Regions:
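Charged, low-complexity, helix-prone segments enriched in Lys/Glu/Asp/Gln
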Residues: 95, 150-151
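Short, structured protein-protein interaction patches enriched in aromatics and acidic/basic residues
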Residues: 135-139, 143-148
Length: 183
């Protein structure tokens, strides 16, 4: 009886650890996919989830890239995956957009994090100034975070030529998009 209880406890602990690894973000890895995952593998990797394929044909004929939207059984949007090359199931992944707060870095940063969470927990590699957003790059995890400039000082809001530094981004600025790029 004790052996059965120990076996059940061990199984429970292992399954809990596996669940966490299904949502971890680290360099070259997002949950169950990695930098070497091919598009043709997505159906088997996400066999318990739902995949919406927006391939560059039909309604999406003018789309510049194929998109694979991953939803869980409760219809929650988890990820959107874009391959390096359109129409090639043997191609690897170029970009992953994170939609679920369950996907986190080892330091707890997720789609619901604010800029202060990113800057305190990860080394910021670069900051790009675009028309409406700031793009914050974190090379140690292949990530970039898009943050809306609407909460920034007015002098940054409508200019793209101004250099933006860490101190210029309000700490409570929320992440608009959490992207992983594997170029």
């Amino acid at each position: 009886m004790k052996n059965i209880l120990l076996l059940l406890l061990a199984t429970f602990i292992i399954s809990c650890n596996n669940t966490d690894s299904n949502f971890k973000i680290e360099k070259g890895v997002v949950g169950r996919i990695n930098i070497e995952t091919k598009i043709e593998q997505l159906d088997s990797i996400f066999s318990n989830d739902s995949i919406v394929k927006r391939i560059g044909e039909g309604d999406y004929v003018f789309s510049s890239s194929d998109k694979y939207l991953i939803f869980d059984k409760k219809k929650n949007h988890l990820l959107t995956i874009m391959p390096k090359q359109q129409h090639d199931p043997d191609e690897t992944i170029e970009t992953v957009q994170i939609f679920s707060k369950n996907f986190k870095t080892a330091k707890g940063v997720n789609i619901e994090s604010s800029f202060i969470d990113i800057s305190k927990n990860h080394k910021i590699s670069n900051i790009q100034n675009t028309i409406n957003n700031v793009i914050v790059f974190v090379d140690e995890i292949d990530a970039y975070f898009i943050i809306d400039k609407k909460n920034m000082d007015f002098k940054f809001q409508n200019e793209t030529d101004r250099k933006i530094e860490i101190k210029d981004i309000p700490p409570k600025s929320k992440v608009k998009r959490f992207m992983i790029g594997w170029n």
